[in-house]
């Protein structure tokens, strides 16, 4: 399971001209689900993402996690993160979980974020989404479990 996390001043997701998820300061989390992923991996990745200290403290040192910084998260499914790009000029998505399993684990990841007490917004699984982000920094990390 892969999470590409971006520290955001704001972010939103639009589907069919309608905003379906929106946050102020916090994290935009692009989530890719691989074939061998499990609920345990989703839980571990969620804990890592929410615990990752990439927000500035009183000395402007990256020392606070999203909850400590008072931020929220916007979780967006992103199957292209699991692409194999090593050969040729076209990505292969054979490592990706089936759509049903990817949706199940995506929803599980979202539920875990909410259980940790972090305000959590989402995109719409498998939809054609327009994602907007004001990246703060920019600060972007690739986390994989």
UniProtKB/Swiss-Prot annotation:
It catalyses: glycyl-tRNA(Ala) + H2O = tRNA(Ala) + glycine + H(+); a D-aminoacyl-tRNA + H2O = a tRNA + a D-alpha-amino acid + H(+). One of its GO terms (cellular component) is cytoplasm. Its EC number is 3.1.1.96. One of its GO terms (biological process) is D-amino acid catabolic process. Its main location: cytoplasm. Keywords: Cytoplasm, Hydrolase, RNA-binding, tRNA-binding. A motif (Gly-cisPro motif, important for rejection of L-amino acids) lies at residues 137-138. It is found in: Cytoplasm. It is an enzyme of class 3 (hydrolase). The keyword Cytoplasm applies. Pfam families: Tyr_Deacylase. GO terms for molecular function: D-tyrosyl-tRNA(Tyr) deacylase activity; Gly-tRNA(Ala) deacylase activity; Ser(Gly)-tRNA(Ala) hydrolase activity; tRNA binding. InterPro entries: Daa-tRNA_deacyls_DTD (IPR003732), DTD-like_sf (IPR023509). Belongs to the DTD family. Homodimer. A Gly-cisPro motif from one monomer fits into the active site of the other monomer to allow specific chiral rejection of L-amino acids. PANTHER family: D-AMINOACYL-TRNA DEACYLASE 1, D-TYROSYL-TRNA TYR DEACYLASE. An aminoacyl-tRNA editing enzyme that deacylates mischarged D-aminoacyl-tRNAs. Also deacylates mischarged glycyl-tRNA(Ala), protecting cells against glycine mischarging by AlaRS. Acts via tRNA-based rather than protein-based catalysis; rejects L-amino acids rather than detecting D-amino acids in the active site. By recycling D-aminoacyl-tRNA to D-amino acids and free tRNA molecules, this enzyme counteracts the toxicity associated with the formation of D-aminoacyl-tRNA entities in vivo and helps enforce protein L-homochirality. This is D-aminoacyl-tRNA deacylase. It comes from Yersinia enterocolitica serotype O:8 / biotype 1B (strain NCTC 13174 / 8081). The lineage of its organism: Bacteria, Pseudomonadati, Pseudomonadota, Gammaproteobacteria, Enterobacterales. The gene is dtd.
């Amino acid at each position: 399971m892969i999470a590409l996390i971006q520290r955001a001043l704001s972010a939103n997701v639009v589907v069919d001209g309608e905003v379906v998820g929106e946050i102020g300061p916090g994290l935009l989390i692009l989530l890719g689900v691989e074939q061998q992923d499990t609920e345990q991996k989703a839980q571990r990745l969620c804990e890592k993402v929410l615990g990752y200290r990439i927000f500035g403290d009183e000395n402007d040192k990256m020392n606070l996690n999203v909850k400590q910084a008072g931020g929220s998260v916007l979780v967006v499914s992103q199957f292209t993160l699991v692409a194999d790009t090593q050969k040729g000029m076209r990505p292969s998505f054979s490592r990706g979980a089936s759509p049903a399993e990817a949706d199940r684990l995506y929803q599980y990841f979202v539920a875990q974020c909410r259980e940790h007490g972090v305000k959590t917004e989402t995109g719409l699984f498998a939809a054609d989404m327009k994602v907007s982000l004001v990246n703060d920094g920019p600060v972007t990390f690739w986390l994989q479990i």
